[in-house]
């Protein structure tokens, strides 16, 4: 089995694509989804994001309904930064449980070291560009503006929390998190590098930290 966790709208054939977004369920009732968008409860971005019926709606933190050691490969991109560090540890522990001995987990996430280096370089890029500190805060993505009336903000908040970053990693801290989950981390890799299957379909963001870990045999 190959698991794609937090798949979003990136649905890859041959993988079990899993996402906990309410949009997975709303995509199964298109008329309701369009109605919520018309009254402004959902944004255009929510409306445009579509999920096929074979996407599994599940929360990894609650545990996935698969036996131990049944996954050869697990992939998740830009997921763990949306979790607190204790939650991320539980998330990777669930990945370790699901992996077969010798199975491989690949994680991509924003690279905190790259973000800090860009801030310290202090390059503004023109008089109309954001100040380095403002760009740094924007890149951290720890805040999401929620426009709209009270009901719209209430509903959007339940969608938007998934987009806020809670904890970022550099290569050393991500490797430590992997070890704490019982995995053996490898060195940082490049975009679509590392001998992992279907990266041409799974990996769509070129920037970030790319690392793999194996479950010990």
Please report, for each region that a protein language model flagged, where it lies by residue:
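Short amphipathic alpha-helical surface micro-motifs
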Residues: 1, 36-40, 150, 192-195
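Conserved SAM-binding loop
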Residues: 3-117, 172, 211-216
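S-adenosyl-L-methionine-dependent methyltransferase catalytic module, highlighting the catalytic core
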Residues: 47, 87-94, 100, 104-216
